[in-house]
UniProtKB/Swiss-Prot annotation:
Subunit structure: Part of the 50S ribosomal subunit.
Entry annotated with the keyword Protein biosynthesis: no
Gly residues: bias regions: 21-31
GO cellular component, one term: cytosolic large ribosomal subunit
Molecular-function annotations in GO: rRNA binding; structural constituent of ribosome
Keywords: Ribonucleoprotein, Ribosomal protein, RNA-binding, rRNA-binding
Role according to the record: Binds to the 23S rRNA.
Annotated source species: Chromohalobacter salexigens (strain ATCC BAA-138 / DSM 3043 / CIP 106854 / NCIMB 13768 / 1H11)
Region (Disordered): 1-58
Matching PROSITE patterns: RIBOSOMAL_L15 (PS00475)
Lineage: Bacteria, Pseudomonadati, Pseudomonadota, Gammaproteobacteria, Oceanospirillales
Name of the protein in question: Large ribosomal subunit protein uL15
Originating gene: rplO
Amino acid sequence: MKLNNLSPAPGSKHAEKRVGRGIGSGLGKTGGRGHKGQKSRSGGSVKPGFEGGQMPLQRRLPKYGFTSAKSLVSEEVRLAELAKVDGEIVDLESLKKANVLKDNTQYAKVILSGELNKAVTVRGLKVTKGARDAIAAAGGKVED
């Protein structure tokens, strides 16, 4: 055994450094905070984005864009998720019941992602071209 091979026992914890407990600790007096200044004081920190009184970047740049209200109540449904619905008919209500869609969702679109192994009838949902073909290939149909 040599000094360079020593290591702590597995599972052991290292005691954390106690700040401000004398010179010998290596973190005495100023406790790693340097001398004076705002950041050395207790509670002394600047809020995120503050640039010393200069107009912050976030306020210098213009606002743009908006969040469409329709996007908040719209969701995409993967093809594989249609199999989670109990029964043959898949519509907005049955998808909500199967916990595929949120309760406040008003519009949904079936997209081609994953595989569909059972025949289902999709009713009242938008369906992409690829998903429409996949539903038909699985023996199901789409009613608009």
